[in-house]
Amino acid sequence: MARKKKRRQQPGQRILVAALAVALLAGAFGLGWHFGVESTRFRGNILLVNESHRLEADYVPDELVNLYQQRHSFRLASSEIMLTRQTYEAMERMFHAAEEADMNGYIVTSGYRSYQRQQEVYAQSEPGKAQQPGASEHQTGMAFDVTVETGDGFENTPQYSWLMAHAHEYGFIQRYPANKADITGISYEPWHYRYVGVDAATRMHQTGQVLEEFLGGNG
């Protein structure tokens, strides 16, 4: 009996099959699939989020805690502000140390922000004043905004100077410094701090790097 000849796949068919397989795997493992936008970048457990490395709409960090329900050495602008537990605990240690150094009056104004909430913020903001949904660090639950009651601007206060000198000791970095806007893509934000852990924060403090540089790329 004559054997059936196997139909050979053409090169184009093999490429298409491979591409479909990669897409299916990306979906199955939650890797994200954005055209023109890379998946978020990690170094160890440090997460990079910016316009080029976005979070999925359904990303919610583990162990979010409501700061109003926790003991805290700082004031809150709202009773609904949340952060990851690890970030909150490091922040509480930091502001407790500030309090002992007679640096009082810190007011935390923002923390975790969902993808959907960021959509609202983006829609209500002037162009260039807010990150697009998925590109905001607030969605990680590891970033917060802080200020004090002053008419001079937070960056002109002793509380700001104390943070700049000591934040890294508790694992925090000022995420968007004035001299790195060309790398971060974000204008100077003296009020915005991000938890990355003591080792990474200390190294960035010593070298003057921002997160994009520390993780090995500018976006």
Model-derived segments and spans:
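Extracytoplasmic cell-surface/polysaccharide-interacting catalytic and binding patches
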Residues: A2-G111, Y115-G219
